[in-house]
Amino acid sequence: MNSVSPAAAQYRSGSPEDARRPEGRRPRGPRVPDPNGPRPSGASGPALGSPAAAPGEPDEVDKFKAKFLTAWNNVKYGWAVKSRTSFSKISSVHLCGRRYRFEGEGDIQRFQRDFVSRLWLTYRRDFPPLAGGCLTSDCGWGCMLRSGQMMLAQGLLLHFLPRDWTWAEGPGLGPSEPAGLASPNRYRGPARWMPPRWAQGTPELEQERRHRQIVSWFADHPQAPFGLHRLVELGQSSGKKAGDWYGPSLVAHILRKAVESCSEITRLVVYVSQDCTVYKADVARLVARPDPTAEWKSVVILVPVRLGGETLNPVYVPCVKELLRSELCLGIMGGKPRHSLYFIGYQDDFLLYLDPHYCQPTVDVSQADFPLESFHCTSPRKMAFAKMDPSCTVGFYAGDQKEFETLCSELTRVLSSSSATERYPMFTLAEGHAQDHSLDDLCSQLSQPTLRLPRTGRLLKAKRPSSEDFVFL
């Protein structure tokens, strides 16, 4: 069999199909929700028979249930880690826009280094309580937010570091159980990292400083600009709260707001497409500077799409592969139904992904030389395209005007390819502004004759589509 289980690279397989988690007794106090069941809003007041907890702090029942769900979640994840997944020696592997062939040890090592260098953001436990409640873990409900964090983190790596950057201390691939992590009792928020090595002023030192700074921005602390606390806070304006399920479209808008409000990042903006359409003039207006001679800002473009009905329509698979081959693609925030994953590549008919469902202790990033192992995954995982949830968000990054023009050319080619002629494209590129197109559509409708129907009875109220609905084939 022409495959390699690269123990040469110790690759591990992906997680099995989700099983329903057993539900125990329901205390009256706030509880960690069942990830596969309805998302509760929580309740106030302590559980019967338990001492009242201080405001904003979980009681003993909540702590026990959080620990139980964490243990159950990690049992499922750990079981999957024990099995191996094989990679073909014949077919190319595409990872974050780069192509690899496992023809020799050097090829495997380059893939190892590239994969391990991606930021891996997972469930965490024992962090400060989230606003408006007493949850100290996102286990069971925060996977889509974590997938969104990983996509934004990949954009920040491209924005601040060279495209060929890899983590110099990245370990070899193997089981993804990080070692030596502490669960701090006190939280002081993101702080500047004091370098432990390398001579002052070297490029390696500056890149490692930036790497650690990016990681600290995603810390599980209220002060972190892209941490879970901040994302949950921004989701409140859309009616979401800690413990709710977040869809890929909503998370895209939350990320846009988070970048807008971050004072530490001034040359990066986020654009979220409307109605599966990227309007070039809107992007240009967003990234342009008041001075026409000044350079454009960098932009992360997020495109929420729906690629089928209940399941993925296979006609979209070639287009998804084409997009994942682009160096300007940040990957796909999606997953399986009720199980979010971050897709960063593929081989043959299988997607490569990072899984946020492993629950780890919170890391205090205010400590000098805080451990990085839990932010980098050593276990590549694969999933068949057929299992992909059709609702997802595709991400792209353009560092300047030239890269944006290159991206538009690539997308035009991919979306208008021969494989897309007999179906709806994943999304479209359009000249001008969204406002102009809306006005043109309105004028064309007003210019047509209007047919008035007699009132023959009670009018039926049309169902209003949700923000997560899209037109699909």
Curated annotation (Swiss-Prot):
Short name of one Pfam family: Peptidase_C54
Renumbered residue ranges of the record's region Disordered: 1-59
Entry's Gene Ontology BP terms: aggrephagy; apoptotic process; autophagosome assembly; mitophagy; piecemeal microautophagy of the nucleus; protein localization to phagophore assembly site; protein processing; protein transport
Catalytic activity: [protein]-C-terminal L-amino acid-glycyl-phosphatidylethanolamide + H2O = [protein]-C-terminal L-amino acid-glycine + a 1,2-diacyl-sn-glycero-3-phosphoethanolamine; [protein]-C-terminal L-amino acid-glycyl-phosphatidylserine + H2O = [protein]-C-terminal L-amino acid-glycine + a 1,2-diacyl-sn-glycero-3-phospho-L-serine
Record region (Cryptic mitochondrial signal peptide): 63-102
Residues recorded with modification Phosphoserine: S466
Enzyme class name: hydrolase
Activity control summary: Inhibited by N-ethylmaleimide.
Entry-linked InterPro entries: Papain-like_cys_pep_sf, Peptidase_C54, Peptidase_C54_cat
Residue stretches of biased makeup (Low complexity): 39-56
Active site: C143 (nucleophile), D355, H357
Keywords: Apoptosis, Autophagy, Cytoplasm, Hydrolase, Mitochondrion, Phosphoprotein, Protease, Protein transport, Thiol protease, Transport, Ubl conjugation pathway
Domain of life (superkingdom): Eukaryota
Residues spanning the membrane: none
EC number: 3.4.22.-
Site (Cleavage) residue list: D62, K63
Extent of Basic and acidic residues compositional bias: 15-26
PANTHER family: CYSTEINE PROTEASE ATG4, CYSTEINE PROTEASE ATG4D
Disorder this protein is connected to according to its UniProt record: Defects in ATG4D are the cause of a neurodegenerative disease present in the Lagotto Romagnolo dog breed. Affected dogs suffer from progressive cerebellar ataxia, sometimes accompanied by episodic nystagmus and behavioral changes. Defects are caused by impaired autophagy: neuronal cells display cytoplasmic vacuolization in the nervous system, as well as spheroid formation and cytoplasmic aggregation of vacuoles in secretory epithelial tissues and mesenchymal cells.
Family of this protein: Belongs to the peptidase C54 family.
Protein name as annotated: Cysteine protease ATG4D
